[in-house]
Amino acid sequence: PGVTKVTIDWGEMTADERSAVMTRARWNAKEQASDTQVPLNARVLAIASGKGGVGKSSVTVNLAAAIAEQGNIVGVLDADIWGFSIPRMLNMPDRLEAQRVEGSDKPRIIPNERKVGSGLLKVVSTGMLVEDEGTALMWRGLMLTKAVEQFLNDVQWGELDYLLIDMPPGTGDVQMGLARMLPRTDLVIVTTPAVSAQKVAIRAADMARRSFLRVAGVIENMSTFTCEHGSMYELFGNGGGQALATQIGSPLLGNIPIEAAVAHGSDTGEPIVLSKVGAAAEAFAAIAQRIISETVSMQDMVGCSARNEKVVQVSVSQRR
C-alpha cells in the first residue's frame, strides 16, 4: 500500500538559532574562499552605501586616517573602480608600480604609502593607474570584478592591521565579488538622515545578509548643520541613521555633522580628522576609536573560536 498520511511539524527558528545558522554560513564561506594577499589577522571593513552622494569615500579616508594615527597599519582599497576619488582625498597621486618580491613567481603591485601619526596608510586605486583623474574607465561588470580580484591577490599588502575598502554605491558586481573573495569582510553602511536614503541603504544591508556578511554598524553622515550663531539645523531630516540601525539590528556607530571643512579636507587631501578641530573631526575620531576597541575585543576572543565552531555545528545539526 502507498503512503496514506504525512505529518509535518514545523516552527519558526528563534533569533539564537538564526544567528547560529548565519555564523555557520560565514564559517563555510571563509573555509571555501581562496587565499588572498590580505593578511589573515587584518580586520576588513567595507564602507558601503545604497546610493551615491552620501559621503562614503569621505568617511573611508577619515576613518582610515584616524585608525592609522593610533599607530596602526591601515590598507585602503578603492573599489569604486569607475568613481575613484581616494587618491585626491589623501593627496596621493603617484602611479602604482609592480616589483618582484621574494617568494612570488610574478611581480606584485606595491601600494603607495603615507605616514599618519605613528601609523601608516597603504593605498591602491584605479586612480593610481590612469594617466590623470579625468580619464574615464569604460569597463563592463566582469572587468570591475577582475580589478578588485587583482587588488586582493596581486597587491603586496605586507603587514596590515586593518583594510578599509571604499565600495561603489549599490549592490552590483563588485559587492558580490568581494563577498565571494573576502567573506570575512564586515560592512559599515553610510547613510544620511533622510528617509529616502535610509530606504535605499537597507538594500546594502540586505545584500550583506544574503551574502552572509556581518554588518558592523551604521554611520549617519550629513547629520546636522550648526551656523556661526550656534543654531542647529537638520537640513536633510532626522533619524535616518538610527532607524536603519534599528531595522537591521546593528549599532549606530556615530553621526557626522555637516561642516565645510570636511569637503575642504577632501579637496586638499588632508582628512579633517587629522586637524582635530570641529565636531566632525571629533565624530570621526570617536567612531574610529569604537572600531579599534571592538577589534581588540574580537581578537581577545580568537582563542575561543574553535570551541565556538563546535557549538555552532551542534546547534545547526540539531535543526536538521
Task: Outline where the language-model segments fall.
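Conserved catalytic-core segment of NTP-binding enzymes
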Residues: 154-157, 161-268
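C-terminal boundary of histidine-terminating zinc-finger modules
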Residues: 268-280
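Extreme N-terminal, non-catalytic leader segments
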Residues: 1-49, 95, 288, 295, ...
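Walker A/P-loop phosphate-binding motif and the immediately C-terminal alpha-helix
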Residues: 43-81, 201, 205
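C-terminal accessory "lid"/substrate-recognition subdomains
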Residues: 234-260, 277-282, 286-320
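Residue-level signature of catalytic and energy-coupling elements of molecular machines
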Residues: 41, 52, 78, 86, ...
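Helical mechanochemical/support elements of P-loop NTPase systems and associated helical scaffolds
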Residues: 37-40, 59, 63, 81-82, ...
